[in-house]
Each structure stands twice: as structure tokens, then as C-alpha cells.
Amino acid sequence: MFQDTEEKPRTLHDLCQALETTIHNIELQCVECKKPLQRSEVYDFAFADLTVVYREGNPFGICKLCLRFLSKISEYRHYNYSVYGNTLEQTVKKPLNEILIRCIICQRPLCPQEKKRHVDLNKRFHNISGRWAGRCAACWRSRRRETAL
């Protein structure tokens, strides 16, 4: 479909324009499990501002299940350290509102209110592979569940 790396759209919005379709009609497969993305997953992909990836010139997204799984694997393999909001601002030398911080679970960019919530509740931000992570409002309440034996 897209052979030249220069012409490959990187965002879902740009891909829709290139294919002359809309976000409501585009069909993508998951890059990991190869299953077609459900409509809600396409919307989540766009809302999370994730990047379209290409395999053999074909565009792929990622389904919710694979995204959460890969996020957890990345956390386990590439966790560096955690800091409080004030320390993060001093380290990066930028205010929190200018720092890209994604949700550690669903990878959505955190809005200013979600970042403020971390500071107000004295919760830490995590450095994973050189990128900053916290929890969005939707994932805030979801906790790791222990399996009963």
C-alpha cells in the first residue's frame, strides 16, 4: 500500500486523509494479534494519539488487549525510576503541563487535571524507557488484581 517511507502517514488522521476515508470507516488490524480493530479501538487509538506502524507497506494499529499487555511488558522490562511531580519539573526543567506523560496502562496522554491529581495525591510519575508515565482518570481506579489460588 505505502512503499515509500516519506509518504507513510504516521497518525490515524493523516492515514484517513491519504486513503480518502474517515475514522468512522477505516479498517485496521492489530500489529500484534492481527485481528481487526473494533470501532471503539480505532477511536481509542486516535484519542491516545498513537502512531500508525507499517509492516510490508500496510498500516496497522493496536487493539486494547495487546496495548495493555505490551504496556505491562514495557513497564517490567524498561522501568527506570519514579519521581514526584515537583522533582519531575526540576529534572526536565519544564512545567508539568509541557511534559508529555502517558498513561502507564492505556497510553493516552495525561491532561493537566490528571497530572495535577498525581501532585495533589502525592503519587509518582514513572520513567519507563526514557518516557514519562502516570495514570489517566479512566485507569486511575483500576488496580492490579491478585489471582486467587
From Swiss-Prot:
The keyword Cell inner membrane does not apply. One of its GO terms (biological process) is symbiont-mediated perturbation of host apoptosis. GO terms for cellular component: host cell cytoplasm; host cell nucleus. A motif (PDZ-binding domain) lies at residues 147-149. One of its GO terms (molecular function) is PDZ domain binding. Coiled coil: none annotated. A zinc finger (unnamed) spans 30-66, 103-139. It is found in: Host cytoplasm; Host nucleus. Keywords: Activator, DNA-binding, Early protein, Host cytoplasm, Host nucleus, Host-virus interaction, Inhibition of host innate immune response by virus, Inhibition of host IRF3 by virus, Inhibition of host RLR pathway by virus, Metal-binding, Modulation of host cell apoptosis by virus, Oncogene, Transcription, Transcription regulation, Viral immunoevasion, Zinc, Zinc-finger. Belongs to the papillomaviridae E6 protein family. Forms homodimers. Interacts with ubiquitin-protein ligase UBE3A/E6-AP and thus forms a complex with human TP53. Interacts with human NFX1 and MAGI3. Interacts with human IRF3; this interaction inhibits the establishment of antiviral state. Interacts with human TYK2; this interaction inhibits JAK-STAT activation by interferon alpha. Interacts with host DLG1; this interaction leads to the proteasomal degradation of DLG1. This protein may be involved in the oncogenic potential of this virus (cervical neoplasia-associated virus). Belongs to the high risk human alphapapillomavirus family. The cancer-causing human papillomavirus E6 protein has a unique carboxy terminal PDZ domain containing substrate. This is Protein E6. It comes from Human papillomavirus 33.
